[in-house]
Amino acid sequence: EAMKHIDRDKVVLSTKCGLEWRHETPVLHKVVDGTTVYRDLSAKSIIEDVEDSLRRLHTDHLDVLYTHWQTPDFGIYPLEETVEAMMKLKEQGKIRAIGASNVTADIIRGYCKYGQLDVIQEKYSLLTRRVEKQLLPTCRELGVSVQAYSPLEQGLLTGKVTMETTYPEGSTRNSVSYTHLRAHETVLDLV
């Protein structure tokens, strides 16, 4: 509803596809609050996700479409099919940029082999720097942009978190490894 009242040209809309809860697929992702979530990067699912997003957001295009979780190890949804579906959506003007989250250097190369990859989204912060070893050099080589997520480690690096800070039961921050007592103290000493 909010998008109905916003000048679309002043907003960058990005969304993700590839997690499926409408129907069962061969690749289980996880169960959340009793809802089973599957991974599905088939062309049919990607196109359905985009059409649903366009309708819900009252827009004719998405600026960035990310695949949320990759599935190449399962051999069920060929990367070529995933990329071709995204390229088709881009050619139709329904998406402007192709993105991928939770990738490896090989997956980045695969996207570029079968079509195009404009941007990846990976966890990157002062504490989580694994992207620097392979992903950043690969992206630099292939001209792929990088968008960091969780650069402040869910608030831990803001300087506002103390050893006395608690989070509500069920908060995802309780499961982050940095919030375990000993690691939490070490990190806070650095901040």
Regions found by a protein language model. Name each.
Residues 1-21:
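N-terminal binding-site loop/beta-alpha segment at the start of enzyme catalytic domains
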Residues 14-15, 100, 146-148:
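Hydrophobic residues in well-ordered beta-strands that form the structural core
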Residues 132-171:
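Aromatic-lined glycan-binding groove of carbohydrate-active enzymes
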Residues 179-186:
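Conserved small/polar residues in nucleotide/adenosyl-binding loops
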